[in-house]
Amino acid sequence: MKSGKFWIAVLVAGIVANVIDFLVYTQWLGPTYIMSNPVLFRQDTNPVWFVVGDFVAVFVFAWIFDKVSSVFGSSVQDGAKAGCYLGILVSFPTYIFMHLMFNGYPYGLSWISTIYSVLWYVMVGAILAAMMKKRGSAA
């Protein structure tokens, strides 16, 4: 069973991730891509699923980071580095393939989504590392 520190870190990082996603997708990408391509993007999706999805993504990242922090280290910089690696692993092929697979998916949006997602994972990694910091053994 995970510690209270783990769950608080997931909660805080999940809230921050949702706020950032809300701003990026409603203020920037929404008007630029989503609303201008109503055939490409579903307009009837319940927004609750985006919130749930962010919390699930943060939980999975936290779980993985908890397992590999002994390799990466547990500092904020180490969490950001782990986030960068995970973000590249997840985002780079995903968004480029979306452009290759779906008619009308803008190539520019593939790169915007890739870069934004990597930065998202870096931010989440830094938050999780800061909050899940493992203390050294007592002297």
Predicted regions and their residues:
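Juxtamembrane/disordered regions of integral membrane proteins
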Residues: 1-139
